[in-house]
């Protein structure tokens, strides 16, 4: 997906075939099981399932073009001599220009292999980037407990 594209733009027309958009985004969601590199972009597009516009359809097609351009980017699990668990988190402060809510995410590695990941829009608006990061870290602790 392009940087700084306005997916919330009301200038473009609504799609005639909403079902086609929903089917494509649904298939992309299924594909995120093995392609974590598209998870965030697909998550953003899934926010427009109720009223997709032409700009959303174009962004979905660009994700398909990206997938086609780099076919070997899926998950590959390798045997390492250890089973250390590493967890990383991050939060994008006020990432959603529609409602200014932050997006937090995390990924878990066991033995150097990615096993879980998640990206989610936070439920409340954070007042600072530190608060958004703290919420992301708290979410991970609750998820792993």
Language model feature labels by segment:
Residues 1-145:
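Divalent metal-binding acidic/histidine catalytic loops
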């Amino acid at each position: 997906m392009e940087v700084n594209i306005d997916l919330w733009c009301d200038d473009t027309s609504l799609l005639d075939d909403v079902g086609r958009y929903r089917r494509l985004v649904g298939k992309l969601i299924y594909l995120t099981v093995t392609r974590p590199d598209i998870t965030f972009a697909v998550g953003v597009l899934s926010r427009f399932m109720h009223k997709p516009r032409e700009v959303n359809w174009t962004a979905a097609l660009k994700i398909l073009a990206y997938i086609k351009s780099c076919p070997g980017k899926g998950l590959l699990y390798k045997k390492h001599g250890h089973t250390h668990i590493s967890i990383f988190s991050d939060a994008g402060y006020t990432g959603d220009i529609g409602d200014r809510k932050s997006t937090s995410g995390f990924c878990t590695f066991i033995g150097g292999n990615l096993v879980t990941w998640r990206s989610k829009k936070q439920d409340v608006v954070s007042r600072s980037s530190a608060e958004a990061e703290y919420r992301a870290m708290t979410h991970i602790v609750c998820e792993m407990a």
